[in-house]
């Protein structure tokens, strides 16, 4: 009996295998975003073009191997063969091996609109600020989400996503 989630699992496996094959040959590849951890920069269903780079900078949106799958998050910093990444809307960050980074997002397609990621440094700073607010509230998600500074950052990010999407449709 097929479960309803099987097609999604098949798509993830296909994306992962295809991405790994292209990455080994240093070719750009595309994958579909699933989930909301990168909202508002990326949303569920967006397609991202990814290219391997010699070096990655804080603020870059990167794709890395994690728990047998691929994850798309923002790079906060990298040192000593380790990288710290975080989804823009996540409260937690994760440490990954720099070897597991497959590439950097170079373009995003949402529907008929394609655009390049905006200032990664700005978004990394805002994402880090959200993390600091979360830590200040003792890692209490509910208290964090009620914090005026957190709400202001969220409002700004959602407005930015809306603005970028509407600008792209005018092209």
Residue ranges: model-predicted function:
Residues 1-171:
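Extended hydrophobic leader/signal-anchor segments used for secretion and membrane insertion
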